[in-house]
């Protein structure tokens, strides 16, 4: 079974990719999750990391310099270079299989309504399956677009960055399946936070704002596609 690794270290962090970013020396929590993701945390940002790398990515160690450098690289060649100045804690843990979040009543109803009226995603769309199971959890809706291409839909009541990250992980996994690939993504929610919309757009994920009242048959506005 895969393990999650927790490291507390004095370190500097450099991101090298589409842009560059530098975090000066400080004590930080380095989180290596079983899904392959790596994130760097401080003590003042709740759950949000200072920097991160989404799976699939690979960790190697460069030990030729004065301090070891942990290099996390993804398939696009982007890197997190973590220079380790000192380690205070390093432990690994098996968390077991997580049952996942249980959708609240509104999200479950949104999923059912969108599955019933799949044309709201676009003309010619057809539903393949609700709760399409993957190795990392169920995709809310798996559909086909008007050209027969695969589309994965993640549905939230409030669309935030963690929802986009969740859909990104599903897409990366589904696109390894030669039967389904290429798979596009749609992030659907009653309200989508600006940061989540920017991240989704940057990753080629389409956003759909849902009007719950309209979907229940009440006249309260139009659907908005962005």
From Swiss-Prot:
One term of GO molecular function: DNA binding
Primary subcellular site in the record, as a coarse category: cytoplasm
E.C. no: 3.1.-.-
Top-rank lineage group of the source organism: Bacteria
Subcellular localization(s) per the UniProt record: Cytoplasm
Record's GO cellular component terms: cytoplasm
Keywords, comma-separated and alphabetical: Cytoplasm, DNA-binding, Endonuclease, Hydrolase, Nuclease
InterPro entries documented for this protein: Endonuclease_NucS, NucS_C, NucS_N, NucS_N_sf, tRNA_endonuc-like_dom_sf
Family membership: Belongs to the NucS endonuclease family.
Role this protein plays: Cleaves both 3' and 5' ssDNA extremities of branched DNA structures.
Name of the protein described by the UniProt record: Endonuclease NucS
Source organism: Mycobacterium bovis (strain ATCC BAA-935 / AF2122/97)
């Amino acid at each position: 079974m895969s393990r999650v690794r927790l490291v507390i270290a004095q370190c500097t962090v450099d991101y090298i990719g589409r842009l560059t970013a530098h975090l000066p020396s400080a004590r930080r929590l380095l989180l290596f999750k079983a899904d392959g993701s790596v994130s760097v945390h401080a003590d003042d940002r709740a759950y949000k990391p200072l920097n991160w790398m989404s799976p699939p990515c690979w960790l190697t160690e460069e030990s030729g310099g004065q301090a070891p450098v942990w290099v996390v690289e993804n398939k696009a060649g982007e890197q997190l270079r973590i220079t380790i100045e000192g380690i205070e804690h390093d432990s690994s843990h098996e968390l077991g299989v997580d049952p996942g979040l249980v959708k609240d009543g509104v999200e479950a109803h949104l999923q059912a309504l969108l599955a019933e009226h799949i044309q709201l995603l676009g003309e010619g769309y057809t539903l393949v399956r609700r709760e399409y199971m993957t190795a990392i959890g169920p995709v809310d809706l798996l559909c086909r677009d008007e050209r027969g291409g695969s589309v994965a839909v993640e549905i939230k009541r409030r669309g935030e960055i963690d929802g986009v990250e969740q859909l990104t992980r599903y897409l990366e996994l589904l696109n390894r399946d030669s039967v389904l690939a290429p798979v596009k993504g749609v992030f659907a929610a009653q309200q989508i936070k600006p940061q989540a919309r920017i991240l989704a757009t940057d990753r080629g994920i389409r956003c759909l704002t849902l009007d719950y009242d309209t979907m229940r048959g009440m006249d309260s506005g139009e659907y908005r596609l962005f």
